[in-house]
Amino acid sequence: FDNVLAKELVNRGVDISFEHEVVDVIFNEDGTSKTSIKDEEGNLYFVHAKHIIDSSGYGRVLPRLLDLDKPSAIPEHSSIFAHVKDSRRPDGEEGTLITFDVLDKDTWLWVIPFSNGDTSIGFVGLTEFIDSFEGDTSERLQSMLKHSKYYHDRFEGLDFNFPPVSIKNFSKSVKQLYGKGYALTGNSAEFLDPVF
C-alpha cells in the first residue's frame, strides 16, 4: 500500500529518494533546518527546509533524533501474525473483505486477504494474553485461532507461509507532536498498530 502511494506521488511530480537514511537534523532559531542524509552508497548530502513533516512511520526519525520518545499510556499490547495460503476463502465479496473478530475489549483477530490468494491473520491483545499460550509461535497462533468461533474452521490446520512473528509492546508515544519547524504525523507520532 505504501509503495502504491509513493508511486502515485512520484507520478504527480514529488521527489522521493529510496534507500536513503536521515542521519541528523539541525534546527535554527527561526525553525528552518538542515537535514544530513546518507544515500545508498554512503555519500552524505544536505537538504534545507522551512518545515519538516515527519511521516517516517515506525522508523520514527525525528522522535529518535530529537529525543522525543516517551512511554505510551496505552496498556502493553503485543501481536502475533503470519500469512497463509487461504484455500478455504469464501467466494464473492466476503472473501475480499478486511475483517476483524473482536474477542473482547482488548483482543482481536485481523483477517486481511491479499489478491494472490494469501491472507494475513494475526492477533492483537494484552501482552499477558499473548504470552499465556505455550509452544513455538506456530503452536501459539494455532491455539489462539481456537478462540475465534467465526474463523477457526477457515484457518484450522493451514500451514503458515513463514513462522509466525510476535511483536511485543509495540505502542510508542512522543513528548510533543510538533515544534518550531516540524510536525509529526501518523505512526511517527503515536504508534498503535502492529505490522501485519
Language model features: what each stretch is:
Residues 7-155:
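Predominantly flavin-linked oxidoreductase catalytic cores and closely associated redox partners
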Residues 1-4:
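A conserved beta-strand/loop capping segment in the N-terminal third of enzymes
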Residues 129-196:
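FAD/FMN-dependent oxidoreductases across multiple families
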